[in-house]
């Protein structure tokens, strides 16, 4: 999903209209593969809440929990400033630092990737996922959802 892509980025900016959510749990799924880069970015308590509730949150909250580098008002200007910050940087230095940052995530994916892919594959064969996907497509709550109190 989108949050996995954001978590895989070295730097991530978002504007005030941006929203984020890990909605897999509402479909009967787990955010298995993307949990690896997410765990490298988001505090464990905040990741637990996002994974277990599927709640939607804004860019400022995403910045506070570590998913974003910055939540900005003017995204285009902020990206321009970031590009300018790279101008004096050595390509070799950037490449080596990127490798250092990516190494733990890649090692975790190497160690657990097959297992996590298996979790996703298994879940896609279940009745709960079929119900979750059908409910989503029909724009209705899934059968397991309890009404608000």
Language-model features and meaning:
Residues 1-51, 64-65, 78-82:
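CoA-thioester-processing core
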Residues 6, 62, 97, 136:
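Terminal peptide-recognition signature
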Residues 54, 127-131, 139:
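Short acidic-aromatic low-complexity motifs
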Residues 132-149:
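Short, basic/aromatic-enriched C-terminal tail that caps enzymatic domains
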């Amino acid at each position: 999903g989108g949050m996995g892509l954001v978590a895989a980025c070295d730097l991530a900016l978002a504007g005030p209209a941006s929203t984020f959510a890990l909605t897999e749990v509402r479909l009967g799924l787990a955010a298995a593969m993307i949990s690896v880069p997410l765990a490298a970015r988001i505090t464990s308590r905040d990741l637990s809440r996002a994974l277990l509730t599927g709640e939607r949150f804004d860019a400022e909250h995403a910045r506070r929990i570590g998913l974003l580098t910055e939540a900005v008002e003017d995204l285009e200007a902020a990206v321009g400033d970031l590009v300018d910050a790279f101008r004096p940087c050595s390509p070799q230095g950037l490449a080596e630092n990127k490798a250092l940052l990516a190494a733990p995530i890649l090692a975790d994916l190497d160690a657990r990737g097959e297992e996590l892919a298996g979790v996703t594959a298994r879940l896609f064969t279940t009745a709960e996922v079929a119900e979750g996907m059908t409910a989503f497509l029909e724009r209705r709550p899934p059968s397991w959802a309890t009404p608000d109190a």
